[in-house]
Amino acid sequence: KEGYIVNHSTGCKYECYKLGDNDYCLRECKAQYGKGAGGYCYAFGCWCTHLYEQAVVWPLPKKTCN
């Protein structure tokens, strides 16, 4: 599974500005989804890879980013 890492309190994606390989995104993806996860910056959001199937990713149901 893959997807954008999401802030559970705001419903927002984690923003990033350095596209491609991005240490911040990799660190955040691993922190939220476990050390097996990968991550990089795609379309100015942190995109996480190698997630478990039940991983919660953006968008959150009934929670819009504002």
UniProtKB/Swiss-Prot annotation:
Expressed by the venom gland. The keyword Repeat does not apply. GO terms for molecular function: calcium channel regulator activity; sodium channel inhibitor activity; toxin activity. GO terms for biological process: defense response; envenomation resulting in negative regulation of voltage-gated sodium channel activity in another organism. Residues 1-66 form the LCN-type CS-alpha/beta domain. PROSITE patterns: LCN_CSAB (PS51863). Disulfide bonds join C12-C65, C16-C41, C25-C46, C29-C48. It comes from the Eukaryota. Inhibited by human antibodies scFvs 10FG2 and LR. One of its GO terms (cellular component) is extracellular space. It is found in: Secreted. Belongs to the long (4 C-C) scorpion toxin superfamily. Sodium channel inhibitor family. Beta subfamily. Has the structural arrangement of an alpha-helix connected to antiparallel beta-sheets by disulfide bonds (CS-alpha/beta). Beta toxins bind voltage-independently at site-4 of sodium channels (Nav) and reduces peak current and shifts the voltage of activation toward more negative potentials thereby affecting sodium channel activation and promoting spontaneous and repetitive firing. Has an inhibitory effect on voltage-gated sodium channel hNav1.6/SCN8A, affecting both the activation and inactivation processes. This toxin is active against mammals and lethal to mice. This is Beta-toxin Cb1. It comes from Centruroides baergi (Scorpion).
